[in-house]
Amino acid sequence: MAEFVRAQIFGTTFEITSRYTDLQPVGMGAFGLVCSAKDQLTGQAVAVKKIMKPFSTPVLSKRTYRELKLLKHLKHENVISLSDIFISPLEDIYFVTELLGTDLHRLLTSRPLEKQFIQYFLYQILRGLKYVHSAGVVHRDLKPSNILVNENCDLKICDFGLARIQDPQMTGYVSTRYYRAPEIMLTWQKYDVEVDIWSAGCIFAEMLEGKPLFPGKDHVNQFSIITDLLGTPPDDVISTICSENTLRFVQSLPKRERQPLKNKFKNADPQAIELLERMLVFDPRKRVKAGEALADPYLSPYHDPTDEPEAEEKFDWSFNDADLPVDTWKIMMYSEILDYHNVDSANNGEGQENGGA
């Protein structure tokens, strides 16, 4: 039986195994508090995320279960990886992951990025997305603050709690407005992996310019700013709008022509602009795929088709339409955690037999 110790962080009780010491708060999200800690077993610095009251409602239980399943399934150098998970005696859930020193939002607000860093960060974002999308997962909430970076400029995508299945009937409001794809605002139902490419394009533009590309105050203003730069959506995109109110709004807007991005980004590398043009396309069907973008000339210093893996198997979304009581989600979560530790111990044993740590 693991020994648990308690610590107060920002008035919140952290009840963690004695394996983790030196807790320091590093961030607060809508669903949990994140602390840095030292892993006494490995000597490494880690991030410990406490999920607040995961069993308080069926919705929160399902969301936590989804995040746990995704963290277990997604194994890629540019995606945050799970190193431990446990349920405390108070029945809070703790995810332990790698700790990276900063995130892209903090970097972008501190100083302009040089060209080689922009290229390398974009390459890693797209490399991670190629893998995630091949697993049948859409992140849906990609933004600078959930792209983590360490001192070696290694980059990892995190916060998969909102991620959803690639599903032709996806539901509305999710990602932070500045990075939200137009099809989420316009159709509210049918969208897919292309929403992440739009978000990555907005992040790319922000790295080039040093400020958000589409800083909308609300949905209407957001859409207006997008059309100022990219022009009015084509008719075949407008025809996919499901909501009559949204359709009337879009049809009432004055016609605008797409502006050449080179006029907006006067100091940027022409190859960067060409790739950005392929990412920021109104019609998601014509937006560049992650794998295609990796092969773009702008990313040629880093592109290696032999080292841009796809997922070995699709993520199992069979639970996602389930409407279950909290107690059932709790049993399923316990089962996943037991499975995680069994797999982990088997791997550790194998490593020791082969002379590993």
Swiss-Prot record:
Activity modulation comment: Activated by tyrosine and threonine phosphorylation.
Residues that coordinate or bind ATP: 26-34, 49
Superkingdom field: Eukaryota
PTM remark: Dually phosphorylated on Thr-171 and Tyr-173, which activates the enzyme.
Gene3D superfamilies listed in its UniProt record: Phosphorylase Kinase, domain 1, Transferase(Phosphotransferase) domain 1
Catalysed transformations (reactions): L-seryl-[protein] + ATP = O-phospho-L-seryl-[protein] + ADP + H(+); L-threonyl-[protein] + ATP = O-phospho-L-threonyl-[protein] + ADP + H(+)
Keyword Nucleotide-binding: yes
Modified positions (Phosphotyrosine) in chain numbering: 173
Role of this protein: Proline-directed serine/threonine-protein kinase involved in a signal transduction pathway that is activated by changes in the osmolarity of the extracellular environment. Controls osmotic regulation of transcription of target genes.
Name of the featured protein: Mitogen-activated protein kinase Hog1
Species for this entry: Zymoseptoria tritici (strain CBS 115943 / IPO323) (Speckled leaf blotch fungus)
Taxonomic lineage from the root: Eukaryota, Fungi, Dikarya, Ascomycota, Pezizomycotina
The encoding gene: Hog1
